[in-house]
Amino acid sequence: MAANARFNWEDPLLLDQQLTDEERMVRDSAQKFAADKLAPRVLEAFRHEQTDPAIFREMGETGLLGATIPVEYGGSGLNYVCYGLIAREVERIDSGYRSMMSVQSSLVMVPINEFGTEAQKQKYLPKLASGEWIGCFGLTEPNHGSDPGSMITRAKKVEGGYRLNGSKMWITNSPIADVFVVWAKDDAGDIRGFVLEEGWA
């Protein structure tokens, strides 16, 4: 009679044996950062209802922000498995900081990398990847949630650019953000993304 297979509750999908050496190294680095740098500060942050922007700079120094962004723009140039492993290790400690990290790395940096001009990539991505700047993603609206088709925020073409008019809510990172990727409909009703900076009005 064959022996029963043994269930590994710490790795039920046997993920570890499927990872490359680089992916394991990234996971271990993220795990160490989360345990050593993030965990000791999370309880104090909860107690005092504060977010520590310095954690973003430390994430950037460790290479955890913009993991999939090309190296020439300050990212780590890693694959999405590595990005998922980073997110998983941060999530183990704190869902809030993982959400903030994901907004920065995915919802802010990826649109700039995929659709931004070369000048925008050069200007924004390195500072976002380093954590020097914090970004947010403005889609959700008070009356329509996150349904882009129903959004009422408008972008009106004016001399020198666009004027945005509308309201957004529940925007992760917005209280401490330096860069904003905001979505609005133009005069033709097409949905467009705009990169804004703190202080622009």
Predicted regions and their residues:
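Intrinsic disorder at enzyme termini
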Residues: 1-22
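Mature N-terminal segment immediately following signal peptide/propeptide cleavage
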Residues: 17-38
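A structural motif shared across PLP-dependent enzymes of the aminotransferase-like
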Residues: 27, 50-54, 75-83
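C-terminal helix-coil-helix/basic helical segment that borders enzyme active sites and/or dimer interfaces
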Residues: 38-50
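Internal helix-loop-helix
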Residues: 61-132, 172-179
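A short, Trp-centered hydrophobic/proline-enriched beta-strand micro-motif
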Residues: 131-139
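A short core secondary-structure module
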Residues: 152, 161, 165-201
